């Protein structure tokens, strides 16, 4: 069984990759260089793909800074500073317009080309920043796109979108990753680029806060280095 796995280099996508491997899939990882602010994640994606010994790792490059619209693609927009409790109140400025639609479309084309049966994505609807494209109704709609928009789908063999983390809290994702052997020290969750050696995560953005809180909830130390 072949599976394309969306791999950002973050905690969730890395766990999704290791889950796909545990499920017996022959894994083809796909990452995206869209000129994002947090380019450190690409180095992490390469490291994770190597550690997981994927069959192939593709990095697709395109430029979403051409129109910006997000703090992750426009450095003139400040990263938000808010509490975890405030994260579900509204869609934040770190939302990249239609990002998962774009990513899944690339993954679908890749999967159909290599005759993969599945596409894994590490979206999560419980501990998240309020993004609309991490929710079950979005995934269900994209599954229909996979069915209707491909030769395989029209012939009755639609590529399946697998979301093994969608109903897990961040702490449960870490527990699963621990069981699967995910090398957390190679992952990168921060919305800033980290600069320096070793790179330092900011500790303040939504993603850092959720990650740190989950490790703390489990009584574990996050192996990443933080500026604060």
From Swiss-Prot:
Residues noted as binding ATP in the record, renumbered to the chain: 7-17
Keyword Chaperone set for record: no
Residues annotated to bind Zn(2+): 190, 202, 205, 208
Required cofactor(s): Zn(2+)
Pathway: Purine metabolism; 7-cyano-7-deazaguanine biosynthesis
Gene Ontology biological process terms in this record: queuosine biosynthetic process
Note on how the cofactor is bound: Binds 1 zinc ion per subunit.
Pfam families the UniProt entry points to: QueC (PF06508)
This protein's UniProt keywords: ATP-binding, Ligase, Metal-binding, Nucleotide-binding, Queuosine biosynthesis, Zinc
Enzyme Commission code: 6.3.4.20
Catalytic activity: 7-carboxy-7-deazaguanine + NH4(+) + ATP = 7-cyano-7-deazaguanine + ADP + phosphate + H2O + H(+)
Keyword Metal-binding included in the entry's annotation: yes
GO molecular function: ATP binding; ligase activity, forming carbon-nitrogen bonds; zinc ion binding
InterPro entries named in the record: QueC, Rossmann-like_a/b/a_fold
HAMAP family in alphabetical order: QueC (MF_01633)
Homology family: Belongs to the QueC family.
Role according to the record: Catalyzes the ATP-dependent conversion of 7-carboxy-7-deazaguanine (CDG) to 7-cyano-7-deazaguanine (preQ(0)).
The name this protein goes by in its record: 7-cyano-7-deazaguanine synthase
């Amino acid at each position: 069984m072949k599976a394309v796995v969306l791999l950002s280099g973050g905690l969730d996508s890395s766990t999704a990759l290791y889950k796909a491997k545990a499920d017996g899939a022959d894994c083809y990882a796909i990452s995206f260089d869209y000129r994002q602010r947090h380019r450190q994640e690409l180095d992490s994606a390469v490291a994770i793909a190597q550690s997981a010994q994927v069959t192939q790792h593709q990095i697709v490059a395109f430029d979403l800074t051409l129109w910006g619209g997000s703090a992750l693609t426009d450095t003139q927009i400040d990263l938000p500073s808010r509490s975890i409790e405030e994260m579900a109140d509204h869609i934040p400025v770190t939302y990249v317009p239609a990002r998962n639609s774009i990513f899944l479309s690339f993954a679908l084309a890749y999967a159909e080309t290599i005759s993969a049966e599945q596409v894994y994505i590490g979206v999560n609807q419980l501990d998240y920043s309020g993004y609309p494209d991490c929710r079950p109704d979005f995934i269900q709609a994209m599954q229909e796109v996979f069915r209707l928009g491909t030769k395989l789908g029209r012939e009755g063999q639609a590529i399946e979108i697998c979301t093994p983390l969608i109903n897990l809290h961040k702490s449960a994702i870490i527990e699963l990753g621990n069981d699967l052997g995910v090398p957390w020290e190679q992952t990168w969750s921060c919305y800033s680029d980290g600069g320096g050696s070793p790179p330092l995560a900011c500790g303040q953005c939504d993603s850092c806060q959720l990650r740190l809180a989950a490790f703390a909830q489990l009584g574990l130390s996050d192996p990443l280095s933080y500026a604060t």
